Amino acid sequence: MKFIGIIPARYASTRFPGKPLALLGGKPVIQHVYEKVAAVLEAAYVATDDERIYDVVKSFGGQVVMTRTDHKSGTDRIEEAIEKIGGEWDVVVNVQGDEPFVAKSQLDTICHCFDDPTTQIATLGKLFESMEAVQNPNSPKIVVDNMGFAMYFSRSVIPYVRGKEMSSWLTHYPFLKHLGIYAYRKDVLRQVTQLPQSSLEIAESLEQLRWLQNGFKIKVGTTDVETVGIDTPQDLERAEEFLKAQLL
């Protein structure tokens, strides 16, 4: 199977404008992401709607494609990008442009999800380590079936452990945190971008619920590697400390 990584990157961000170009350890954040993805997959491209990002990616020797400015999601952007890139790709891996520490093991895990021929879409989950984190609505929870396919994603705490103090729930059930890396069979990517928003997606503000609600199967690979995304300038400061710790 042939895997291509596409990294959607926008300059406009409410909380941190220009974050793909922010310097981390002397290199733009987008360069960190690109180099991690390019080292594992057969090909990697940045998909952007901003000439500043386009120029920076070109300057460090990366592959980049310009996309429209009116996309409502990164999924729509990568679908346009793969159509422009062309080629005979089996699976498209979507890594966010603000994930400079995406690990080789995570990319390997999500690719291996497609060893199962019934996998249409894949994503990653990691076990929660505290109930405080489980209760954070910004950390979506996943429940999976016995075959490793997602049954539901929610910002609410699911499942509810009846008859136990919430402080002890982690000892009774392995709560799984969703990490926002996706991969799609190429034909499935085209199909999901044609779907209208669904009621569950609107309720939870989770795009992947649109796919589940329309009957697509999402395989969940598990990882023990935490992601360190950058959404704010404060996140960038923490990322600098994380990078320094890695280099020690």
Q: Each predicted region: which residue ranges?
A:
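A conserved hydrophobic position in a structured secondary element of the catalytic/binding core
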Residues: 48-49, 102, 184, 231
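Short phosphate-binding loop-to-helix
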Residues: 45, 51-95, 99-109
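N-terminal glycine-rich phosphate-binding loop and ensuing alpha1 helix
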Residues: 2-48
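Conserved core of the sugar-phosphate nucleotidyltransferase
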Residues: 104-195
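Conserved alpha/beta core of the MobA/IspD/sugar-nucleotide pyrophosphorylase nucleotidyltransferase superfamily
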Residues: 87, 169-248
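Short, high-confidence coil segments that cap the C-terminus of an alpha-helix
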Residues: 41, 87-89, 117-120, 216
